[in-house]
């Protein structure tokens, strides 16, 4: 059975102008992202990882080329239409979570979903289910962001990304600011939601985080120079880790 493509690019380019000089960050990129995959984007600094992530989600407009998301060419949408599409179909987890200090944990979680005009009662029910799933105790739901640990805040960020039932969760270095213990907890959550069918695209420079992915894409100079299929994550799978290390070595990482 053929894999279902959820995002596809055709000759995607992203160019920035700095001091009158054109910098070509993404170059004629043809890429397919498959539904249900935990896709990891790796590469050296400046390879275009985060730029690609933001382009795929429509957060940053492509300079040239096409991006088909759930069969729709989002490059043809106006900025307002792209924002509406993004709120409905995308969830985001960043290195810095940016929870709103004046809002409770529950209200922070609901904030993204309410922008999609879903019923608050339905969103609240879903939020409670996911908060429990990621082990955010009910006693924390009415508390405020400054009362959370770094790992708890990042898990709340993941719940916020999931509450509107997105097609894809986009994660940009989600464990970059966390210690080892909190990093493991966040990776466990991402792995768990992927096993339930959630499509994830994650940018990371960390081999431990990358090891949770089912498919690794390696970027170099704005184009894909290799990829590696790892399949679904299983704890303690040393062969999987060795395969990833060999692939990254081959890529010159």
Where are the predicted features?
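Conserved ABC transporter NBD signature motif
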Residues: 65-73
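Conserved ABC ATPase "signature" region
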Residues: 72-73, 110, 121-139
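Short coil-to-helix segment of the ABC ATPase nucleotide-binding domain corresponding to the Q-loop/switch region
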Residues: 103-112
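Conserved ABC ATPase signature
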Residues: 144-148, 152
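Conserved catalytic motifs of ABC-family nucleotide-binding domains
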Residues: 165
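Catalytic Walker B motif of ABC-type/P-loop ATPase nucleotide-binding domains
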Residues: 169-172
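Conserved beta-strand-loop-alpha-helix hinge in the C-terminal portion
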Residues: 223-248
